[in-house]
């Protein structure tokens, strides 16, 4: 039995992993899908001090209080920033890092540095309850998610929540970068995203112990949950 912790990306919540989590649990594995502070069902906690550090600590605390070890830790999109920081703080609890169409930051980089498309979202920056936020159900960046099925869109869109911009602009601080880089890692990429990456970033996305490419949109855990689950199951095999 494997233990999976699946970390969502910007504007999402743990809800986005429901289809994948069902498959993994049916196969007998433990699955945790934490929602980061200020998002999803925790959107009522939105406040000005939420940043990348806090959302990294959200997941570190799950590992600690659920007493999790040998974790297959996966992050989607912005979640790649989060899982990299989690591994830095809880190295001894991680068996694999899995990047789901995700950012793979170096020390001192922010998501804004790693993913230029997020700067399109910054054009929509607004203030909600005193917090600078981007994304949400009405964001013009939502087509990038690649969800086109009407039923999926009707289920997903109302659940998208504004995300504090500070999370995307704060550089990650890694104390154990070499050790984090030495962890086994897998990369599950979406074909359209991979093709759009600059050569250097594309090479980094393919530099992993296990690599998959799925021809689907960015929200692959919703559009291709079986393919994502199959890859995650293969990592545990």
Residue map of PLM features:
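Residue in the alpha/beta-hydrolase core beta-strand immediately N-terminal to the catalytic nucleophile
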Residues: 35, 72, 95-98
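Conserved HGGG/HGGXW glycine-rich cap/lid loop of the alpha/beta-hydrolase fold
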Residues: 2-43
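Short, proline-enriched alpha-helix->beta-strand connector loops that line the catalytic pocket
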Residues: 179-185, 206-209
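Conserved loop-alpha-helix segment in the C-terminal half of the alpha/beta-hydrolase fold
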Residues: 189-222, 234-235
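Gly/Ala-rich beta-loop-alpha elbow adjacent to hydrolase catalytic centers
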Residues: 74-75, 79, 83
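Active-site nucleophile elbow and catalytic-triad environment of alpha/beta-hydrolase enzymes
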Residues: 158-177, 192-194
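Active-site loop/oxyanion-hole signature of alpha/beta-hydrolase fold enzymes
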Residues: 30, 38-71, 88-89, 116
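Flexible "cap/lid" loop of the alpha/beta hydrolase fold
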Residues: 88, 92-137, 167-168, 173, ...
């Amino acid at each position: 039995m494997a233990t999976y912790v699946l970390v969502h990306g910007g504007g999402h919540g743990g809800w986005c992993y429901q289809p994948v989590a069902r498959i993994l649990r049916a196969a007998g594995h433990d699955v945790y899908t934490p929602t980061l502070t200020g998002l999803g069902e925790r959107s009522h906690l939105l406040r000005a001090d939420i940043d990348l550090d806090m959302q990294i600590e959200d997941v570190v605390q799950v590992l600690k209080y659920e007493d999790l070890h040998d974790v297959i830790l996966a992050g989607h999109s912005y979640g790649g920033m989060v899982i990299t920081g989690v591994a830095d703080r809880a190295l001894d609890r991680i068996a694999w890092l899995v990047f789901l169409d995700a950012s793979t930051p170096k020390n001192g980089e922010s998501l804004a540095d790693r993913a230029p498309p997020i700067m399109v979202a910054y054009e929509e920056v607004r203030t909600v309850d005193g917090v600078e936020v981007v994304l949400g159900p009405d964001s013009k960046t939502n087509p990038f998610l690649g969800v086109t099925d009407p039923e999926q869109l009707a289920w997903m869109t109302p659940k998208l929540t504004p995300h504090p911009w500070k999370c995307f602009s704060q550089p990650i601080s890694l104390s154990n970068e070499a050790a984090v880089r030495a962890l086994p890692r897998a990369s599950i990429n979406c074909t359209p995203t991979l093709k759009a990456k600059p050569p250097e970033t594309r090479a980094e996305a393919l530099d992993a112990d296990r690599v998959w490419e799925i021809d689907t949109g960015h929200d692959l855990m919703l559009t291709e949950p079986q393919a994502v689950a199959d890859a995650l199951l293969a990592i545990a095999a």
